[in-house]
């Protein structure tokens, strides 16, 4: 099944973007070629843009504290797996401590590094990081892969508490959902929400159907409309019945 996720609010939208960026960053950092490390570095700059939002850290701390207060009363409850509970609470408490230790504006260390700042300013220009534009960057790219990797890992280190916090919030949100099998009649599905607040919607569809869900929602109703991509033409709505799994997640 192919999984599509749709955020219901701006906070979850930001966390999903952050998750995607960190996954891309980790993939390219693990590679050996300097061109792949270039992608890791430019992705690091994107991460800095997202994490530089003034309220992101405080939002994550508030959400983690809320989750801690929700879960802590279950300690000693015989109906709850205590080892799993303690693992989650320990992870939350450690991440809260790491967030509290973060000083200043997130990503400021990249701004203060004049060499990285020069690369960052050129990276937004198409072809702007050629060897004749940034010979010092080209020289760095010729260093051994492990040395480049250590440098990039050092530069991302101050932002890792935000990655960990986002991962916990998204995991708890995803685990809160219960999947149900539904049918989009003639490619369209809608469901009343009865005023309930959700954080995230997941749509799982069989890959052989080759359909693409497009979703929207408000506090009263959600809509899922399936389309199909054919060649160079924009995705068009389908008029066939489409079975899929729908999960609504709410922290």
Curated annotation (Swiss-Prot):
Where does this polypeptide localize?
A: Cytoplasm
Can you tell which superkingdom this protein's organism belongs to?
Bacteria
Keywords of the record, alphabetical order, are: Cell cycle, Cell division, Cytoplasm, Septation
User: Where mainly found?
Assistant: cytoplasm
Q: Does the keyword Phosphoprotein apply?
A: no
One cellular component GO annotation, for this chain's record?
Answer: cell division site
Q: Which InterPro entries match?
A: ZapD, ZapD_C, ZapD_sf
What Gene3D superfamilies does this protein map onto? YacF-like, YacF-like domains
- Segments spanning the bilayer are none
GO annotation terms (biological process): division septum assembly; FtsZ-dependent cytokinesis
Annotated family: Belongs to the ZapD family.
Query: What job does this protein perform?
Result: Cell division factor that enhances FtsZ-ring assembly. Directly interacts with FtsZ and promotes bundling of FtsZ protofilaments, with a reduction in FtsZ GTPase activity.
- Which HAMAP family does its entry note? ZapD
User: How does the record describe its quaternary structure?
Assistant: Interacts with FtsZ.
Q: Which PANTHER family match?
A: CELL DIVISION PROTEIN ZAPD (PTHR39455:SF1)
Q: NCBIfam families per the record?
A: PRK05287.1-4
What's the protein here called? Cell division protein ZapD
Q: Which organism is it from?
A: Burkholderia cenocepacia (strain ATCC BAA-245 / DSM 16553 / LMG 16656 / NCTC 13227 / J2315 / CF5610)
């Amino acid at each position: 099944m192919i999984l599509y996720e749709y955020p219901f609010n701006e906070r979850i939208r930001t966390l999903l973007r952050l998750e995607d960026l960190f996954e891309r960053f980790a993939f390219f950092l693990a590679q050996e070629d300097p061109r792949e490390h270039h992608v890791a570095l430019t992705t690091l700059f994107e991460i800095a843009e997202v994490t530089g939002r003034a309220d992101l850290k405080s939002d994550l701390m508030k959400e983690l504290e809320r989750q801690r207060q929700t879960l802590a009363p279950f300690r000693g409850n015989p109906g709850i797996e205590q080892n799993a509970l303690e693992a989650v609470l320990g992870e939350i408490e450690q991440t809260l401590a790491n967030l509290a230790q973060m000083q200043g504006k997130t990503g400021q260390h990249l701004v203060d590094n004049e060499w990285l700042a020069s690369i960052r300013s050129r990276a937004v220009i198409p072809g702007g990081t050629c060897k004749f534009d940034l010979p010092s960057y080209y020289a760095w790219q010729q260093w051994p892969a492990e040395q480049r990797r250590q440098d990039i890992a050092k530069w991302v280190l101050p932002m890792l508490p935000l990655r960990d916090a986002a991962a916990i919030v998204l995991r708890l949100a995803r685990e809160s959902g219960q999947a149900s099998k539904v049918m989009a009649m003639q490619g369209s599905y809608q469901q009343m929400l009865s005023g309930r607040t959700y954080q995230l919607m997941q749509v799982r569809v069989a890959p052989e159907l080759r359909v693409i869900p497009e979703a929207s929602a408000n506090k009263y109703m959600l809509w899922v409309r399936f389309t199909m991509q054919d060649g160079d033409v924009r995705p068009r709505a389908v008029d066939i019945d489409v079975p899929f799994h729908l999960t609504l997640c709410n922290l």
